Regions:
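Conserved, mostly hydrophobic/aromatic
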Residues: 170, 187, 223, 253, ...
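Alpha-helix N-cap/loop-to-helix initiation residues
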Residues: 17, 53-56, 231, 299, ...
Length: 436
């Protein structure tokens, strides 16, 4: 009997990338490959890459160099696949799989094992690809691409095509997941707000969310990132959809800066004022909603005054989650051609904003101490877990909770008393199981 070839998949980046890795895994299994949890046992390694941040790309590049030195056959997938020159400079024999060609990964592995270094960039029909299920969480892409032309963004270059999945396809994936005991559906996208564009069917994001929530079963839905211009355009119907009991009371709206001037120079398709307005309406209609946002610190044209406006925005809005990135010039973007700010200034500003955000997040989370909340257990932690809890879960507001004393099954709802908190989440003590 011939032993199956073993493949190790390493994933970087957002939930959309993680969803692509799910597809890669399923495709490899169907092609007869065996997946392994360590590169040590692998005949080949697939790196599903991310290029949003320069630091991440540098980390991946170093990883590629190490694997190349160890003579490991490599397949490079994800957004970094657009930078063939860099990949081939590190490893001329690596196979490259574009973001539209991920089901070609089995062929690419054969190619990498032969050392041919072929580039696969054909466009595939992703509608026909199944979605692997790993209960209790299932990632489902609803659309790809975006309508923006941000001057700092390389993802648009790596994923240039705009398309939406048919609603019947998405609903079928949801139904299949629920049948296999999925409890959390994560809807992934570069920008969920573009959903419906390009489809002959007249449907938009709020309508899709409502249709998903009509599916029978005990589950929750987490909506992926939506840019401010689309959140503003569909604000009222979006709020109505988020109010459904099956929707996590959570929204991720990246504003990127608190300066109107910098926002315009980034070529963002919204204003900072739009962001203030959206958050205000969201909190009035859904008072307990968790607000997440993204900030880029140190954009080339950002002045000290611009940065202080960003600090004021965070202090005023007080988001529950702030993802802070130090600006890094990305290949092929307009912002890369601009005169860059000194590294020390960017580091100093980033550290200051991070401290402001941590204080806000910590104080907001501390308000939960003493409260009893419903938590869906989603994950078991290794080595007795973070904060001493064996399991972690999510509240209806998508707050992460480390749960002490839980002995049940992943996917169960439990009542938890919050006994501690930090900027990253909550710490709870089990009270009893509950039915939702």
């Amino acid at each position: 009997m011939i032993a199956k070839r073993k493949v190790y998949i390493e994933t970087y980046g957002c939930t959309l990338n993680q969803s692509d890795s799910d597809i890669i895994s399923l495709s490899l299994k169907k092609s007869g490959y065996e997946l392994t949890t360590s590169e040590s046992f692998a005949d080949a390694v697939v790196i599903n890459t991310c290029t949003v941040k320069g630091a991440t790309e540098n980390k991946i590049s170093e990883r590629m160099k190490k694997l190349t030195q160890n003579k490991v056959p490599l397949v490079i997938a994800g957004c970094m696949s657009a930078n063939e020159r860099l990949i081939k400079k590190i490893n001329p024999h690596a196979a490259i799989v574009g973001t539209t060609s991920i089901t070609s990964v089995a062929e690419a592995i054969n190619d990498a094992l032969s050392g041919n270094g072929t580039v696969f960039k054909n466009r595939e029909d992703k509608e026909t690809i199944g979605r692997p299920v790993s209960a209790p969480i299932m990632r489902i892409p609803i659309c790809e691409g975006c309508t923006s032309r941000c001057h700092f963004c390389q993802t648009k270059i790596a994923r240039p095509f705009l398309f939406s999945y048919q609603p019947k396809t998405i609903l079928k994936w949801v139904e299949d997941g629920i049948k296999q005991r999925v409890k959390e559906i994560q809807l992934t996208a570069m920008d969920a707000g573009v959903y419906g564009m390009g489809l002959e069917t007249q449907i938009d994001l709020p309508s899709l969310l409502s249709a998903i929530c009509e599916t029978e079963g005990d589950f929750r839905v987490r909506l992926g990132m939506i840019n401010p211009q689309h959140a503003k355009r569909m604000c009222e119907p979006l709020i109505s959809a988020l109010a459904h009991e099956k929707m996590y009371k959570f929204i991720h709206i990246p504003v990127q800066t608190g300066s109107e001037r910098v926002c315009k120079e980034m070529n963002r398709q919204h204003t900072v004022k739009n962001f203030y307005e959206i958050v205000d309406v969201m909190r009035k209609k859904i008072p307990n909603i968790t607000i997440a946002t993204d900030i880029i610190v140190g954009y080339p044209t950002e002045t000290k005054e611009d940065f202080e406006e960003t600090v004021r925005l965070i202090e005023t809005i007080q988001p529950d989650i702030v993802n802070i990135s130090k600006f890094s010039p990305r290949e092929g973007t307009i912002a890369k051609k601009m005169k860059q700010l000194p590294t020390q200034i960017v580091k100093k500003r980033s550290a200051k904003l991070a401290e402001v955000a941590r204080q806000i997040q910590t104080e907001k989370n501390k308000k939960f101490i003493g409260k009893v909340v419903h938590v869906m257990i989603t994950e078991r932690q290794q080595q007795n877990g973070r904060h001493g809890g064996d399991y972690t879960g999510r509240t209806n507001e998508y707050k992460q909770v480390a749960v002490k004393g839980f002995k049940g099954k992943i996917g169960e709802w439990v009542k938890v008393k919050i006994i501690g908190a930090n900027y990253g989440g909550l710490i709870g003590k089990l009270k009893n199981s509950c039915k939702k």
